[in-house]
């Protein structure tokens, strides 16, 4: 399962760890992903999405119905 938020599209990004001596070693910054069940009133069922914390805030703001409509237009399975 890929580490991508289904709502915002956030993915891992790369950067450097920096020691006290400023030596650089490669690392990945991972999104804060959670599998979360959302109740969809119109369909009378739960939908499980893999979303970041920011994605949950977007769902709180726009509503699950609007977000699911956006996912459908992108052709993403949920």
From Swiss-Prot:
Q: Which GO terms of the cellular component aspect does the record hold?
A: cytosolic large ribosomal subunit
What are the entry keywords?
A: Ribonucleoprotein, Ribosomal protein
Check the record and name the InterPro entries matching this protein: Ribosomal_bL28, Ribosomal_bL28/bL31-like_sf, Ribosomal_bL28_bact-type, Ribosomal_bL28_sf
Q: Which GO terms describe its biological process?
A: translation
What molecular function terms (GO) are annotated for this protein?
structural constituent of ribosome
Among PANTHER family, the record links this protein to: 39S RIBOSOMAL PROTEIN L28, MITOCHONDRIAL, LARGE RIBOSOMAL SUBUNIT PROTEIN BL28M
Protein name, entry field: Large ribosomal subunit protein bL28
Q: Which organism is it from?
A: Erwinia tasmaniensis (strain DSM 17950 / CFBP 7177 / CIP 109463 / NCPPB 4357 / Et1/99)
């Amino acid at each position: 399962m890929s580490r991508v938020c289904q709502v915002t599209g956030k993915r891992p990004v790369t950067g450097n760890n920096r020691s006290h001596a400023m030596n650089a070693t490669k690392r990945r910054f991972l999104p804060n992903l959670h599998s979360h069940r959302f109740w969809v009133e119109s369909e009378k069922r739960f939908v499980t999405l893999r979303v970041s914390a920011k994605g949950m805030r977007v769902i709180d703001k726009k509503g699950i119905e609007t977000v699911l409509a956006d996912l459908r237009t992108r052709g993403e399975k949920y």
